[in-house]
Design a protein with these regions (language model features):
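Receiver (REC) domain switch/active-site region of two-component response regulators
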Residues: 85
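Conserved phosphotransfer microenvironments
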Residues: 18, 23, 27-52
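Alpha4 helix (beta4-alpha4-beta5 surface) of REC/receiver domains from two-component response regulators
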Residues: 64-78
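Short hydrophobic/Thr-rich beta-strand motif most characteristic of the beta2 strand and flanking loop
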Residues: 6-17
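A Lys-centered signature of the CheY-like receiver
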Residues: 82
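Receiver (REC) domain switch/output surface
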Residues: 88-101
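A short, hydrophobic beta-strand element within the central beta-sheet of small alpha/beta folds
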Residues: 50, 55-67
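C-terminal output/effector regions of signal-responsive regulators
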Residues: 105-169
Length: 169
């Protein structure tokens, strides 16, 4: 099943309850949508396992009502309580994936900034790294533009949440 929104496309995989959830946890998942009412396997255990084994995965918890035990306090990125529309679900998923993309872009931006600083130092000491330096500067510019583009799509609250997650790393 494909969800194709204006900016975000995602492939959806469903859990196979005939196998252990632990076997299905994959760090490559961008997003987990978790029904907080799930009893077998236990939703709380699934959330804990994903946080331990795939910490980069965004976790959206859905629940019929506000649960007494807050999934966000337990490590979920977002709680969506019912009843909610398809549009609310889609926009929440899109926002979480944009936040994840922003974090990835900023991680690469910071990595390239460090690399640029090292190459500048090597250039000043006479090493022939001009081509590498120009390549990194060009990539850095592209990532800065990409980050600005994503930032423009996030509300102030969404941007602050993405920034907090970056600083928590």
């Amino acid at each position: 099943m494909e969800i194709d929104r204006s900016r975000v496309a995602a492939q959806v995989n469903r859990a196979d309850y005939s196998r252990s959830i632990l076997e299905q946890i994959d760090e490559r998942y961008d997003l987990l949508v978790l029904d907080w009412g799930l009893e077998r396997p236990d939703a709380r255990g699934i959330l804990d396992a994903f946080r331990q084994n795939a910490p980069e995965t965004q976790i959206l918890v859905i629940a019929g009502d506000v649960p007494p035990d807050d999934p966000v306090d337990r490590g979920a990125d977002e709680l969506l309580t019912g009843p909610f529309s398809d549009e609310a679900l889609h926009s929440t998923i899109e926002r979480l994936l944009l936040q994840k993309e922003y974090e990835a872009v900023m991680d690469e931006f910071f990595r390239l900034s460090t690399e640029r600083a090292l190459l500048e130092s090597e250039l000043q000491s006479g090493l022939d790294v001009a081509n590498e330096y120009q390549s990194v500067v060009s990539e850095l510019y592209d990532y800065r533009e990409r980050a600005a583009s994503i930032r423009d799509e996030l509300s102030a609250d969404e941007f602050n949440q993405a920034l907090r997650q970056l600083l928590d790393k």
